[in-house]
Amino acid sequence: MTLIKSISGIRGLIDKSLNPSMIARYAQAFSLVSPNHGKILLARDTRNSGKEYIKISISALERISRKSIVVDIVPTPTAQFEVFSKGYAGGIVFTASHNPSNWNGIKFIGPEAVSYTHLTLPTICSV
């Protein structure tokens, strides 16, 4: 059950190394390292698992009183632009880029539209 953690985010096999409980934990952990104001943007690529991951994230964020906004299917740069231009606290994008369809991944976006991963991944993964 491979889970790949790198500077570009987290990637894993759908429902195996990247399962619903992990998605919820990562969403909540990301919220904890994000600024306290503003919503967390949620986006995805065209993989079907992204729909479920967004629902899981909404629920997980609501449990800790964090609001989210869903932009659904958009490229990562569009999600980054939305985070920055709308003043959101950050963003979570479910995408696995070039990986096979049985994979998905998570990219974390900071409030200034840049990848948050190099700063936050150790904290997020320790939760």
Where are these regions (language model features)?
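Generic structural "secondary-structure junction" signal
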Residues: 12-16, 76, 108-111
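Acidic/polar active-site rim loop that often engages polyanionic ligands
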Residues: 99-114
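Conserved small/polar residues in nucleotide/adenosyl-binding loops
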Residues: 117-122
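A residue-level detector for conformationally permissive "hinge/kink" positions
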Residues: 1-4, 35, 83, 97, ...
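An N-terminal, well-structured beta->alpha segment
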Residues: 1-64
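General structural signal for secondary-structure boundaries
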Residues: 19, 75, 115-116
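N-terminal small/polar loop signature for handling phosphorylated ligands or for N-terminal nucleophile
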Residues: 40-103
